[in-house]
Amino acid sequence: MSRVADTIARRKGEAAGALIGYLPAGFPDLRTSVDAAVALAENGVDVIELGLPYSDPVMDGAVIQAATQRALANGFRLRDGFAAVREITSRVDAPVLVMTYWNPVMQYGVDRFADDFATAGGAGLITPDLIPDEGADWLAASERTGLDRVFLAAPSSTEARRRQTAANSRGFVYAVSTMGITGVRTDVDAAARTLVGRLREAGALSACVGLGISSAAQVAEVLDYADGAIVGSALVTALAKGGVAAAGRIAAELARGAVRG
């Protein structure tokens, strides 16, 4: 079983759901991004999702785009992502998933990326613009290295796509709660509940919901039917406005919503 799946199973055993927290590597600088990720884990975040800055982030909303563009402007390089993963995993036990668009992985070399990422202590990849039937190289590399592979499913996904995604994901399936780009929303789209049910019918062992979650109440709402809640923009905003301490405080607030019952 994967480290991420182990974490989700442990939280289920504690009558709780998994809280997954996203931050971009290198924002506002590499050192601070590492310290912030550690602070999330120390304040109740179960799995760290570390975003690799990319020049064409088609799924990211304004908050995350601004953060990743600042990281790139400051000179972020892919090797910095591996260094960040290495230090985070040396300081906390929470597994670290990297969210990356596929082009940087291809440019680096899929096998080389998998090897270097696994050596750094990474748990797996979330690949928003890669679908399983176009990812044969990644499927092979992840099998060889034992890395998790988290594919996305949306409310618009066909039954065939949901089955393919469920069959090829390891760790969990990322259920996109609403159509569109990332960002804080007042209400988490009700389509997420239906999507998670359909993913379970398709064979998904675990499904975690992301896009739009920003409060403990929304975390609790999502964990009523999903295995994990993924929070990004709210944490990035806290880091941008108040630094590491603020990100930790928001993480602690969100974690209160992860306890069921």
Curated annotation (Swiss-Prot):
Alphabetic keyword roster: Amino-acid biosynthesis, Aromatic amino acid biosynthesis, Lyase, Tryptophan biosynthesis
Phylogenetic lineage: Bacteria, Bacillati, Actinomycetota, Actinomycetes, Micrococcales
Subunit structure: Tetramer of two alpha and two beta chains.
Pfam families per the UniProt record, alphabetical: Trp_syntA
Organism, as annotated: Leifsonia xyli subsp. xyli (strain CTCB07)
Enzyme class: lyase
Family: Belongs to the TrpA family.
The reaction(s) this protein catalyses: (1S,2R)-1-C-(indol-3-yl)glycerol 3-phosphate + L-serine = D-glyceraldehyde 3-phosphate + L-tryptophan + H2O
Function of the molecule: The alpha subunit is responsible for the aldol cleavage of indoleglycerol phosphate to indole and glyceraldehyde 3-phosphate.
The keyword Coiled coil belongs to this UniProt entry's keyword annotation: no
MF (Gene Ontology): tryptophan synthase activity
Official protein name in the record: Tryptophan synthase alpha chain
Pathway: Amino-acid biosynthesis; L-tryptophan biosynthesis; L-tryptophan from chorismate: step 5/5
UniProt KW Amino-acid biosynthesis keyword: yes
Active-site residues, record numbering mapped to chain: 49, 60
